[in-house]
Every structure is written in C-alpha cells, then in structure tokens.
From Swiss-Prot:
One of its GO terms (cellular component) is ribosome. Involved in the binding of tRNA to the ribosomes. This is Small ribosomal subunit protein uS10. The gene is rpsJ. SUPFAM superfamilies: Ribosomal protein S10 (SSF54999). InterPro entries: Ribosomal_uS10, Ribosomal_uS10_CS, Ribosomal_uS10_dom, Ribosomal_uS10_dom_sf.
Amino acid sequence: MAKQRIRIRLKAFDHRLIDQSASEIVETAKRTGAQVLGPIPLPTKKERFTVLVSPHVNKDARDQYELRTHKRLMDIIEPTDKTVDALMRLDLAAGVDVQIKLN
C-alpha cells in the first residue's frame, strides 16, 4: 500500500511572513508525530512594471516597480488524524496563500 502524503504549497509577497508560516506548519506537524520534508524554497517570481512619471512628455522619466512572489513547498509523510486536525485548526497570517493536496 502506498504511503499517504500531504503536500502543502505556500505563496506570499513577504518572505518573512512565509517563513514564519512554514515554521508554524512544521512545528505543528512534528508535534503531532508526523514526518515533515521541507520547507523547500521554490524559485521566486519577479514581476517588473515600468511606468511613465510624466503624463505627457519626458519619456526618459520613468519609475520601475517590482513584485516578488515567494513560494515554499512542504510534504508531510504518513500524517495521523491528529495531524490533519491540527493543520485545519492552524491560523496563519492573512498574506499567505495555502494550497493543500492529499495524495
């Protein structure tokens, strides 16, 4: 029989927030007796935007903005019912997007 696994993927714009959330998830899973692989940092997506400062002329005057999306991946191997319960009750920061897959 194949081992059961929970794959958790986190996305956030702030790297401190995502690291804090990842450590909370790892600590909760280990406390309930599950084995955790990760957090594995995935490549950061950088979106750059260039905006003209002047409304009419002066094409040389521009501002550049960058939006970074940080991602982390974690696998929880052989989770118990207690682990799933604790993860569902876990309250993470509002700026972190969480995707959970059961395999």
